[in-house]
């Protein structure tokens, strides 16, 4: 079975996973390297609905441009257009049409008012150097590696990851604040076959309010209903120059 995952957001970082025999005694870094290496080289596009609270769902289009050195993912919904540039090696960069590059706390702005932030879409924690293997676990009936990642100067100092042991795909991530309280959770909830590929049909992003715990959480959900896994997308759609700040204000991520 071939699986194409957009993790955490569902849109986050796309990658392809193939069943493979796993070497024994792997390190956490070796496992994450395999996750990052398992990505498609084809362009593809998806149509989805973003559910935020009790409001009507927001139509979202997701376009993915893959090259040997990086993945560029474009999100379009309402008046918002956001771009995530994820090098194969290195930190992701984030751009918002009419605003320009997002840096610092700007990276944690919400996509269309949801609990999916731009920072989450880049899955930067997959690149953090301080990682360790915690144990083996199960998520939605799948055997997983449980991995802890830590980093200084990031929105979350600690993240726990659950990686599917067969397909080397991220199925769940939980982020913790400086007091080691669970603050965010991302999960793949279901899958859909598009052509010869399987993609996440449902993805959830949950925010846990301060001093509270699960299930007292605020959820947003992205549901994919259509896609084209073998398409050719225009290069200029993904040019960072198109996202420069506009004088007098521009679009924002909560339109």
Where are these regions (language model features)?
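Bacterial N-terminal signal peptides
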Residues: 4-14
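Sec/Tat signal peptide C-region and signal peptidase I cleavage site
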Residues: 15-19
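Flexible, processing/modification-adjacent segments and terminal tails
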Residues: 20-33, 37-42, 87-158, 165, ...
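Extended lipid/amphipathic-ligand handling interfaces
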Residues: 35, 61-66, 188-193
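A short, Trp-centered hydrophobic/proline-enriched beta-strand micro-motif
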Residues: 38-55
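Solvent-exposed N-terminal domain segments of exported/luminal and surface proteins
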Residues: 43, 69-76
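Solvent-exposed loop/turn segments connecting transmembrane beta-strands
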Residues: 53-58, 78-81, 153-156, 179-183
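Gly/Pro-enriched, hydrophobic low-complexity segments
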Residues: 140-238
